[in-house]
Amino acid sequence: MTIAIIGGGAAGFFLAINLKRLAPNIDVTIFEKSANVLSKVAISGGGRCNLSNSFAEIKTLNRAYPRGDKLLKRAFRLFDHRDTYKWFEDAGVPLVTQVDQCVFPYSQNSNQIIVTFIKLARELGISVKTLHRLTSITSGERYTLTFNADTRCTFDAVAITTGGSPKAEGLSYLEALGHKIILPVPSLFTFNIPSDSIRELMGVVAENAMVSLEGTNLKASGSLLITHWGMSGPVILKLSSYGARLISEKQYRFNILVSWINEVNCDKIAEYINSIVRENPQKKIVNVCPYNISSRLWLHILKKAEIPTDRKWVDLGKRGINKIINLLSNDQYTVHGKGSYKDEFVTCGGVSLESIEFKTMESKSCTNLYFAGEILDIDAITGGFNLQAAWTTAYVAAVAISQRFNAI
């Protein structure tokens, strides 16, 4: 029996290795369109490969996976983050869980993952062919695949693990086979805020911020980094993921509301500010930073509120207090465009989960055609969750394929 795996990335290699272990007699070939395999793994986590997460801070799966949580809830019963941890350690890759719950190789080097995968593939007899771009696929009793427009091969089964496609046209061949395609759009990006003085605070971090998309219920909390182009950091990346499709529809022009202190209850903030006034009446406002925010950020807020920096707290007045409360909790910025995140490219969209059997990752319209990884309409916030989805869906597909062909 033969199977072609289209895409030499994380999901493709993980599927191939596990399939070959479960069904050694299956002939497995990985086809990669570029000259190098596992290129996205190489840059994951800034070159350190954030390969999973402890999930300790995830109360409900949809907070990590804005799209695909229902499929993964089922799939995690077979292979979850704990299984991932054990799998890699058993493969000779010691792991470490950071304070932020992100899981990395102890070596902090993504190349260790790449070397391990290539070594295992070689030992298991998996064939890897680079510079093979799939140009067509025809279904029948067997699948006929055409590469580079002139090389034809036939296989008993095919697994598509090509990752996220930036354009729907790249998925047209799957649509022709009867699959519903969700328009792919970026889902992890930073916010460009041109012509705003906030960019002068480049490098300033608000450790506990909350950012919401104005006019919606979408919001996220976490650390916010001010950059020379606008805003980045975990809270921005989360919000970009939660609102990926809506933000795309707005053509990346929208307003955000920032609570620099992760608090929007004006009464609570007023009580706190009034306590500062009582305790520091003769001190200059600029010298007492509320909520321990950065002094540079505090100066920015005072300038925006048009409050003189040499004014004393006792002279602030009710109007001044209200201005500060509003800017601490509800500071508005206009976003014009998006930026990339560490050269990583994650999309929402792809093959609709309506077209997939959750138990097996098999196509509902084509027997012996399987999917794994970001080609599916599954994506996550930053923190190792996207790679975990790749490992899980690849493992589920490997088990399903092995069970079918071992039974023949």
Please give the residue ranges for each predicted region.
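Glycine-rich active-site loop/strand segments that organize a redox cofactor
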Residues: 46-97
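Short hydrophobic core segments
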Residues: 4-6, 31, 134, 152-165, ...
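Glycine-rich FAD pyrophosphate-binding loop
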Residues: 4, 20-46
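Beta1/beta-strand and adjacent pyrophosphate-binding region of the FAD-binding site
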Residues: 1-11
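A glycine-rich dinucleotide-binding beta-alpha-beta segment and adjacent secondary-structure elements
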Residues: 130, 299-379
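A conserved FAD-binding loop/helix module that cradles the flavin
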Residues: 161-177, 377-406
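A conserved short coil-to-beta-strand element within the FAD-binding core of flavoproteins
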Residues: 130-143
